[in-house]
Amino acid sequence: MKLTFFGRLRDQVGTGEIDCSPPANVDDSESLRLWIGGQHSALLDPTVRIALDDILVSGPTPIADVVEVAFLPPVSGG
């Protein structure tokens, strides 16, 4: 599974992409956030959005067949 990070998250994580194999008990988007957030606390921010294979999700969503998980910082505008 590929994890990608955009904007300030890329800076806070220190890279734009990580290849990983989550443990078996990490089976949805929220458990993945908690698992990787243990290493990169910026990802625990509830305003960070998650996209699974280019589809924004909210709440726990299964990740069994997902190839890419993107972590997106909040967008500001004016």
Q: Across the structure, where does each feature detected by a protein language model lie?
A:
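Ubiquitin-like/PB1-type beta-grasp interaction modules and other compact soluble beta-rich domains
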Residues: 1-77
